[in-house]
């Protein structure tokens, strides 16, 4: 079993290592590689399946699935991945704080109700007696949005996490262990979260989390160097994503669902249900003060400072203004 502090040290050291190698970025001019999540349906997967990205940007697009945003950071550091679609903010902050030169260029999705922690049903623990979680065993994907949400919820309920046995587990593995009765509380997102809920209950709803300042959204992230060398390609990529969001918001949603479901590895019913809990900001909304116009930068700083306070990372940046670049999205808006 891995303690929280051991996991934190492992994540921090790993990210410091990848920060030292990110300068080895290599890009094949005829192909780019994009990281994404399975069981995480989004409208742009219609374009992924139909190769609309390839047609728009003029190069082959290879899609590689990941289990967590921390792995996306490592892949971008090594140069194996140029774009990560729907990377969680906490793993981005951990990598950026360690010195990796990444940037947020687009808000992929907002989803307060599709990332959460679930308590084992027979414990009969809810928000009225959450303090009883002390001493219990938890499965949490360290360094991710779910980890951030877990720590914020435990802080809210006054739960001393030092008394808990916390295992670093990706959502799919956590859901399986939870189903077998090996964990008391488990955290995750997407399809794994749905499976977790079959055996337990959440402590807070998405709306309740938002009131505590727990924002849950993902971003499209890139290697800064690669983006600067390929601005037109990146702008075209973001334009296709925005077009797919607009297409899904129109009357085309029904016809898109089967294609999205197949790409995401989920059935049509669960794909539709998941998408109903997602919000996809338009380009105009993303360029506003709420998002890339300042709100996102402030949230990055809040996450960084909180992780320092919790001992997850040794230090945060003075600010994360350089970690956000809206110029590519502004260019996409003109296409």
Model features per residue range: what roles?
Residues 1-13:
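Bacterial N-terminal signal peptides that target proteins for export
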Residues 300-335:
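Conserved C-terminal helix/tail region of periplasmic/extracytoplasmic solute-binding proteins
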Residues 109-120, 202-227, 238-241, 278-281, ...:
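Periplasmic-binding protein-like
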Residues 229-312:
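Secondary-structure end/capping motifs
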Residues 94-106, 195-209, 267, 288:
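Ligand-binding "clamshell"
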Residues 172-264:
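Pocket-lining segment of extracytoplasmic ligand-binding domains
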Residues 21-24:
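N-terminal signal peptide c-region/cleavage motif recognized by signal peptidases
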Residues 30-160, 165-168, 184-190:
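Short, glycine-/small- and polar/acidic-enriched structural segments
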């Amino acid at each position: 079993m891995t303690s929280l502090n051991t996991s934190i040290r492992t994540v921090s050291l790993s990210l410091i290592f990848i920060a030292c190698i990110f300068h080895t970025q290599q890009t094949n001019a005829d192909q780019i590689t994009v990281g994404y999540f399975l069981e995480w349906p989004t409208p742009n997967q219609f374009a992924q399946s139909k190769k609309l990205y390839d047609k728009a940007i003029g190069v082959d697009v290879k899609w590689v699935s990941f289990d967590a945003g921390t792995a996306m950071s490592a892949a971008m550091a090594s140069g194996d991945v140029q774009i990560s679609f729907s990377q969680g903010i906490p793993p981005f902050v951990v990598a950026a704080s360690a010195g990796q030169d990444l940037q947020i260029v687009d808000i992929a999705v907002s989803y307060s109700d599709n990332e959460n922690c679930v308590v084992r049903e027979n414990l009969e623990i809810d928000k009225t007696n959450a303090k009883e979680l002390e001493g219990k065993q938890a499965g949490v994907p360290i360094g991710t949005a779910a980890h951030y949400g877990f720590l914020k919820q435990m802080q809210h309920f006054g739960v001393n996490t030092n008394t808990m046995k916390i295992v670093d587990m990706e959502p799919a593995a956590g859901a399986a262990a939870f189903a077998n009765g090996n964990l008391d509380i488990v955290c995750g997102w997407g399809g794994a979260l749905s499976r977790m809920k079959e055996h337990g209950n959440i402590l807070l709803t998405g709306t309740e989390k938002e009131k505590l300042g727990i924002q849950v959204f993902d971003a499209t992230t890139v290697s800064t160097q690669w983006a600067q060398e390929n601005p037109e390609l990146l702008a075209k990529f973001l334009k296709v994503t925005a077009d797919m969001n607009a297409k899904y918001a129109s009357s085309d949603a029904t016809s898109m669902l089967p294609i999205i479901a197949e790409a995401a590895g989920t059935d049509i019913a669960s794909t539709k249900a998941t998408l109903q809990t997602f919000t996809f900001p338009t380009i105009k909304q993303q360029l506003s003060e709420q998002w890339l116009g300042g709100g996102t930068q402030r949230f990055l700083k809040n996450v960084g400072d909180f992780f320092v306070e919790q001992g997850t990372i040794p230090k945060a940046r003075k600010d994360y203004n350089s970690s956000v670049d809206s110029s590519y999205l502004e260019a996409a808006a003109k296409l």
